[in-house]
Amino acid sequence: MIKSKIVLLSALVSCALIPGCKEENKTHVSIEFMHSSVEQERQAVISKLIARFEKENPGITVKQVPVEEDAYNTKVITLSRSGSLPEVIETSHDYAKVMDKEQLIDRKAVATVISNVGEGAFYDGVLRIVRTEDGSAWTGVPVSAWIGGIWYRKDVLAKAGLEEPKNWQQLLDVAQKLNDPANKKYGIALPTAESVLTEQSFSQFALSNQANVFNAEGKITLDTPEMMQALTYYRDLAANTMPGSNDIMEVKDAFMNGTAPMAIYSTYILPAVIKEGDPKNVGFVVPTEKNSAVYGMLTSLTITAGQKTEETEAAEKFVTFMEQADNIADWVMMSPGAALPVNKAVVTTATWKDNDVIKALGELPNQLISELPNIQVFGAVGDKNFTRMGDVTGSGVVSSMVHNVTVGKADLSTTLQASQKKLDELIEQH
């Protein structure tokens, strides 16, 4: 880290009398690793990984800096202002865009690690999500991901004589046939609140219809025929969900307690499904119309800018080490099933193959991994990732638009035009 080092004269004198001491001091370097694993059991896993790394690299010490997710943004800002950012930071691909915009990422160091690991080590489509806005670099080295889609109870669909829905129309048909509001049973648990989850959920349908918030030139493209079709569809689908504003808890609870046999949620529903005792009864499909679109959130390790050369080199070694098969497997398996590997090597390890959760899920983990190439997110167009998408999500315009037409029964065309105008004004300010 960038700190002024005060060395006592007596220490220098005593060191001069010890053979080899001068060389050791010169070569030893300490770096910090900031992450969001505040739970003790996760810190224990990371401690073992660090101990393994330090044994292989006796000249480097790695100190953990666990930070609650809610405090992450504030912590990064505070540390960057004081010139004391940790050399390695765990970050979502969304937050990495913000860091890159503020020039807090050492793009060259990140590229060095990806070169060390090999671009081919990652599943197709993964590195595309961590591309910088100009498409010339990466914002971090991917370590895991979670994806969202449609979960369904196989037995409920089978009992009703319904097959797994493969496209928009089939999904709507299944939801309508299973919808029984008079008995407080609903066709699908669908996010409709003014929340990030609603934006993420709706984005899958929009992107599967080739509707994006930005075009390749960085212009807002909300008020388009493709977006209108997606919004119309989402409203029709929402007619078969629970009344009111549904967010994370409402959607998850409805699926888990049997109120709805289908739900749009992330892979983080799987721990509850496993606890329930019959995970093979749960199927997964993704919104598909003109193409398949999976919402995905990538977690990366990024290397911060402005560090001393030896600290940056140590950080590169540490992140490269973390991508080795057994190490990255230990990282991913802190959340088995919920967190998906993005490095192909994970599934070859005993850590993955022998895990009870992975075994219990049968073919589902492989199916989920196979969806990684289909990850699409608002603001990513080709090889470009527009950093202003963070401002769009922060404004809540998209989720409010969806909420207003589903829960509020607002006119679609008017709402779409008003939302386009709000985002145009927002982008002009930034």
Predicted regions and their residues:
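C-terminal capping/gating helix-and-loop segments adjacent to ligand/active sites or protein-protein/ligand interfaces
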Residues: 133, 359-419
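Extracytoplasmic/periplasmic solute-binding protein
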Residues: 135-143, 148, 172-219, 260
